[in-house]
Amino acid sequence: MGEQLCPEPVTDGTLVKWNMNTGNRYRLAWRLTPGRRFTTTDLMTFRFVELIGLPFELTPAMLRGVTVRRASCGEGSHMDCDSPLLCDLWRLTRNTVELTTQDLYVDSQSRERGAYEGDALINQLAAYSFESDCATARFSLEYLYAHRTWPAEYILWITEAAYEDYMATGDDSSLVRWYPILRGKTFSAFTDADTGLLHSGNAGGAGTDAVLVDWPPSERDGYDMSVRYNTVLNCAAVAGYEALARIAAVVGETGDSGEFAARAAALREAILTRLYDPATGDFSDGLYQDGSRSAHISQHTAAYALYAGVYRDSAMADRIAGRLWERSLRPDAGGSRIRMSVYGTYFLLMGLYRTGHGSMANSLLLDGDSRPGQRTFSYMLRRSVGDFPSPFDGLPVGATLTTEAWNSVNKPNMTFSHPWGAAAAVAIVRGVFGVMPTSPGFETFSVHPQTESMTGEPILSGELCLPTVRGIIQVSVSRGNCSVRFVGASVPPAKSTSSE
């Protein structure tokens, strides 16, 4: 059993790659005794099964598959549009959420099977794109509140995930219960009085509170990891403080709310003063211990700044996004347009959508370049499992679930069942169709589609059905001449707003 087929039979004659990239060896040897039955149970993540050495001819009628699985997450959810690639991405991410979710959000069932905060944030928001049942998300988050993992940014992202849970459910009981722990998920103790910036307390680059930036390390776009005050970490801290300010307000801790909001504002200003170059529109990777600025500029710095709202006004956000486009995102910039992992790409895409630059985000999301080695979702769909026919869900070749990395060159032990690659689901709902809750439990929501593309054809028409705790939001978009002509929303029985 395995996730891939071998290009040609290996020495033992097998076609299924049972000695997997992940280090698992999915090969079972059974000695069959005439007249006797046996049963076996294991949890394995595989796509192909090969039976070898049977003492009789095997026919399809002899095989029966039995599965134990959660209820389908797709009930009530629907998306269709005039972009075949976007429709394929919708199915790919829906299948990923449905088939990788058991009782806890984990990075992948085919390797660690561990829960991680950064993975859970993307998994959670992707799941909200298809289902209104938020129980698995809440259980996973509450597990992580008490069982943190090592990356420094992850303890900051978990507060954002906590607030997203409240906005999706309208239920504040989890925030009330866990607030004493959530309020401590900061690096305030490591704020430098001279610069106003913070660090994680771990200068060694490994172990608890080491700064991740991105994973695997080959996907960091050459990030200068020797800096003491890391731009990505500081941007994540701004987002974390703002999430805590909102959470504190919900649970009635108004003093804490004001303090966290003030910290977010002060840190934002410190980043812009110390790490941003107004002459170029670029962010440095960070400051060294002596206060000097790193000369290196990675794609991550601008992406995380846009995501976390690290800019003074919309004009500055436009400048940052425009510079990001010119430096690396435009097709003729040289090299890969996306210079981040499938995990980091979530922050890149959503940073662009959040600042109204959906035309740039869509150009990346719908990049049809599926040549070997490209960092595109098209490559993930059509190339990442090899050039073998796939019977799954109508996709001709490629991945059937989102992958851990863009390709195995960047991460040789990559899995082919990694929900942190499902950023496209969030991009479709919150970016392309622009549906966002504006009050807890979707009592009110906004609709602000972004269907343009800086390259290629825009999305001319589409429709989305989004399940929520209050019912299904139905949105249809019809465009012409680069403007949204109509947005129709069938609203569940609660107050709502719709804006073009």
Q: Residue ranges of each PLM-predicted region?
A:
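Hydrophobic alpha-helical scaffolding
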Residues: T39, M79-S83, R113, A126-F130, ...
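Catalytic-domain carbohydrate-binding cleft regions of carbohydrate-active enzymes
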Residues: Q102-L125, S129-L144, D172-S173, W178, ...
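Non-catalytic C-terminal accessory modules of carbohydrate-active enzymes
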Residues: E269, S359-E500
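Carbohydrate-binding/catalytic loop surfaces
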Residues: S110-G114, G118-I122, E160-A161, D165-T169, ...
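The feature captures the catalytic groove of carbohydrate-active enzymes
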Residues: L15-Y26, W30, A146-W157, F190-R263, ...
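Well-ordered alpha-helical scaffold segments within catalytic/enzyme domains
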Residues: L54, I122-E131, I158-S174, A236-T254, ...
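Extracellular/oxidizing-compartment recognition motifs
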Residues: M1-D103, D107, D119, D133-L141, ...
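Long, well-ordered core segments of solenoidal/helical folds
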Residues: R94-L104, E131-P151, W178-L197, R263-D282, ...
